[in-house]
Amino acid sequence: MEKPDAPSCLRNREPILGVLRDHFADRRNVLEIGSGTGQHAIFFAAALSHLNWQTSEQRENLPGIRAWLDETALPNTPTPLELNVMGAWPTQRYDAIFSANTLHIMSWAEVERVFARLPDVMTGDAMLIAYGPFNYGGRFTSESNAAFDAWLKQSGMHQGIRDFEAVDALAVTAGLTLIEDRAMPSNNRCLVWKRGTSRQAASA
């Protein structure tokens, strides 16, 4: 089959890789939630060969991911998992979770579900990295983000750029502590949380 292509993956993969190198250096098993085309997975798995990179997606997107994984044939990219966040989740636990450009596509109920289920798939000291655009103090960080949010809502009113404070509140309830909020190109962010770390320790 013709492999799906997301040009944004080529634009953002190097900056994201920098964050992953910093925070996933001592990690071993990554669950990527919403792997999309699979292009991020093969790039990060090739660059970070110490990681076992587990992709996941809704059923209709799995063939495209398999096509990329089959072509690259990396030893650290197992068969993608079917994951609808409102349905059944994996039974395995991971010491790292990664998700890019998903929270603004999901409905808010789905975002809540993700954070509610994260403790079930995370080890005691697991880390979560979420990449994408976020609002702060209820405000867009750029005119381009405001335009992007309007475009998202034309596609579906359940979509939209999320408020950082609301997402972080879900993370806190799930037992996660924000340890970095890194600015990324094109008005995006990488939010990094760790489980089992107090906010005081994270800011020390």
Feature map (PLM): residue ranges:
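A short acidic, Gly/Pro-enriched loop at the edge of an enzyme's catalytic core
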Residues: 89-97
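Class I SAM-dependent methyltransferase SAM/SAH-binding core
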Residues: 31, 39-87
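Core SAM-dependent methyltransferase catalytic element
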Residues: 176-204
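Conserved class I S-adenosyl-L-methionine
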Residues: 26-36
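Conserved beta-strand signature within the Rossmann-like core of class I S-adenosyl-L-methionine
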Residues: 125-137
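A short, conserved alpha-helix within the catalytic core of class I
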Residues: 106-118
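Class I SAM-dependent methyltransferase Rossmann-like catalytic core
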Residues: 1-26
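Conserved Class I S-adenosyl-L-methionine
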Residues: 141-165
